Amino acid sequence: MSRSLFRCLAAAVTVAGALTVTPSAALAHGGPTPVVVDTARGHGNVVSFTFDDGPNPPDTLHLLAVLRKNHVKAVFCLVGDQVKAHPEVVRRIAAEGHTLCNHSMHHDDLSTWTPAQIEADLAATSALIHQAVPWAHIAYFRAPYGAWGQSPQVAADLGMQPLGWRFDIEDWVPPGADVLAQRIRDRLTPGAVILMHDGGGDRSQTVEAVAQIIPELRAEGWRLTLPLRRG
């Protein structure tokens, strides 16, 4: 499918400045597209866990232990400043088989940036990730605050699929692990990509909530997969 057709499809729906469309078989071919995906792979009761703003020891390390114990793979959306500070944690994330996502260098609002500015930022962030893990594949890009601006096309051109989310558990002000786990229960729908945080503050309650909810989801027949990937 041609890039011009991708652009026509992506332009059809604009939500909060981001390009978002219902997944279709037509977009499943070729490389990344500027369409922001918010859907987990597979059919039926599937869900994807994604974690933003890290790496952030010790919380990221505790989270990795929970995911490893439960045989779950997730997406980690990494901020360049944090990658530079904690490259050893990035190596651990990749070594344990999780998927990497570029979350910009400084967690800036990109909505008013030019394509050239966005490209420079994303390229610098990816370079830091590759310094930590030379063999890493950076599959996704997620715009800070969901302020996409012109970043979806830039990310796609750099080989990264723009990654959105179906819902955010709002863990930036920790209300308690039980409350966070209940938010997942209440908001969960088949195919959801869930936004959580392992960085940006004390995320111990998020780690506890994840440890609570995974066995419950499995018992109810949910499968934890990765988000859709165009290409």
Where do the PLM segments sit?
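Secretory targeting and sorting signals
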Residues: 1-28
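Catalytic domains of cell-wall/extracellular-matrix polysaccharide-remodeling enzymes
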Residues: 62, 84, 108-218, 222, ...
